[in-house]
Amino acid sequence: MALDLPTETLHELADGVFVWLLSGGETGVANAGVVVDDDGITVVDTLMVRSQWAPFAAAVTDLGLPVRRCILTHAHIDHVGGTKAFPAAAVYATPATSWALDQPMPLDAYKSFMSAFADEFDDLAEVGTRPVTHEVDGEARLTPRIELLTASGHTSGDLMVLVEDADVCFAGDLCFFGVTPLAFQGDPATWAATLDVLAELAEVIVPGHGPVGGPAEVRDLQAYLLACVDAQGDPARIGPGPWDAWIDRAERDPINVERAALLAAGRDEMPPAMLRAIGLD
């Protein structure tokens, strides 16, 4: 069952493990986390625009400990836009994320797809993001508390952050709870298989978007992704389920179903519905 926790504040899920939730979870509105080790702080994801990451960074600073590490769960801008708020931290991510952050920002696409933040993207472009300093290409013990697990599904370079002693996993966008997922660069079938692993990792799962949940919410997401695969290109073929109460269905069902059908046909292409959403139709 998803937890009803406060937003825009550091909420302690377990000893030294905090979550920072943004209300809603729609496009551009993500979550972040903090893990405290003996040597200092590890930040998990950094949100997107200044109005989001500045309060988060201030709250992290108020903990009074050095920020040693910043983990990026994947390359999408709503998770990496605030990296420069932590200038002294080492930045850990997969090679795919590292490559993506070295590319120019597609500002016009951001403004079209996330129009609610259009006025802030020029500032984001001016500030920029930090490059990845340490690539993670497999399972890795980052600190005594933190284990990194590579995966794919939402993107080709997803990263799960497991804090085993707290029974908490930061899943990034491998998990959307109460929010329709977005697979425009993903593989719904592979993603569903990845969730078999993720559902067994911890009792507390912090999604990239939406409220904190657990294995039951992971299984609901898995069922939705499999429904997208089974729809064979027709969003109308997605049957009823827990997803009927999720936000952003109308916009994202076509993207997810089209992407699954394209991949099933051997075509690794951007779904037409996503091209329309970013103004490239």
Language-model region placement:
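Short, acidic/turn-prone active-site loops that include or flank metal/cofactor-
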Residues: 95-99, 175, 233
